[in-house]
Amino acid sequence: MKFVNCYNKLEIDRINDLVKTNPLLAKSEIEKYLAKYPNYDWGYVMQANILIVLGEVQKANEVLNALEEKVKSNKRLSKELRELYISKITYLRLRILAYNRNYDILYNFFSKNTEFITKEKLATEWLYTRIVTGNLNGEKLPGYLANQIANYNEVYFKNHIQKHFGVKTQDNSVFSENFPLEKVLEHLPNYLEQPGLFYDYFTDKYIFKLDGCGFASGIDTDLFEVITIHGTDHIINMYPTLEGTYTNSIDLNPILNKGYSRKISQIDKFNQRYKR
């Protein structure tokens, strides 16, 4: 997410990176940062975004309300900077509407604010909003995701992920030959009842752990991502990932691997050997 001048750019860059790799840690780190630099207003934009990713939308709205009041009352802000803040606050409030599935309100806003769609590059979100509210007016559905949002089909999903069962290369994500796809799909709905990580407007993201599940960018990994249509258990994509620092990954090993025992890290081995 774009940000304005900050007190410690390296720290802000690190937090921005954490939003994708470990949003729970990003939440903690931005709180610490704002405790040190409470006047860094863009930090509250970042904080609200992180809270939305984690599904804490009520807290996010409180942060945005306080920030909006502060921005509007700050007479020293330039017109350009004030407009930037208001634009980002609006963008995040729209994501809260999407998280709560208030799609009719979202549609009404987009239909009356086409310049905002262009400015924030939300043409795809505007299309999906028209789909879920039944306002396509005869438009053709372009692409896999649009069709799945309009009319979910599990067979299409299974066909779509076949590309992740091909030959391993340095650039792709592929599951291992013995990945138990059907068993995984049988158990996944049990973990999809609550929304996952919410990075956009219409999908949830979950991270699952299964030892030896596949490869990402040519590197072995025990983790894979599952993407669903927001608020449903309709899976639209899944693939191995290297984003292994998620603290809320879901471990499937005890269920799918009979006789499973946790892998012992080198640190654990050292501690066991020299424990006194």
Specify the residue positions occupied by each region the protein language model found.
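Alpha-helical segment of the N-proximal tetratricopeptide repeat
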Residues: 5-32, 36
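Start-of-helix register in tetratricopeptide repeats
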Residues: 9, 42, 81-84, 88
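Alpha-helical repeat scaffolds
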Residues: 25-31, 58-70, 102-114
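Residue-level recognition of tetratricopeptide repeat
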Residues: 40, 74, 119-120
